[in-house]
Amino acid sequence: MSLCHRNYMLAGLGTLIVILSGIASAETKYTVVAPPVCVNNLGESVSFFSRPTTQGRVAAGMANRDNDGNPVIYRANYEKATPAFQKFVDFHECAHHQVGHVDQPHPPRNSYDHLMNESIADCVAILRVREEDNESYRLVIDGLVDAMTAIGFPKTSTDSRISNVTNCYENYGSSAEFIEGVLNSERAR
């Protein structure tokens, strides 16, 4: 595993567990949804692996490359999140592969670049919700609010994230067009 991928994994894991959490009561168990189709910006199919833990109380995902360099998404504790929120997390993690974040050095946590990467992934994710599972939009928004509130994010952070997701959902074209715009912007750098 390259240093870039290792740093992405280590820095991203903590952030994604906190940012992408669907919290449910300890007794609530949901059916785990099948992962969506995910192909990265290099045309490689992304594999999903479940890694349930006995200690985790939140659902989380992490986009990375495995030790052999294959693109992967690790899913943890999905049975603790609603199916709608599970799909959003999968789409969000897939987006990190689709726009090439996984193959770039991971920016410092909470830096402008890190937050921009997360906003981009949220936007792609909600566009895919609109395209593939539109009836779950409200459930995704509710899941984000519930999770961020339960974790202790300030209301301003929650409101900002919901505003970004809603703006993407209401005002952008397809996820493919959005991804192409991000990739073109990266190429122009």
Question: What is each model feature region?
Answer:
Residues 2-12:
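Bacterial N-terminal signal peptides that target proteins for export
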Residues 21-23:
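N-terminal signal peptide c-region/cleavage motif recognized by signal peptidases
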Residues 26-68:
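Auxiliary, metal-adjacent structural segments of Zn-dependent hydrolase domains
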Residues 50-83, 94-102:
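Active-site scaffold of zinc-dependent metalloenzymes
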Residues 80-85, 89, 111-119:
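Soluble non-cytosolic domains of exported or imported proteins
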Residues 94-111, 128-133:
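Catalytic Zn2+-binding segment of zinc metalloproteases
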Residues 111-137:
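Post-HExxH zinc-binding segment in Zn-dependent metallohydrolases
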Residues 131-189:
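Long, well-structured alpha-helical subdomains associated
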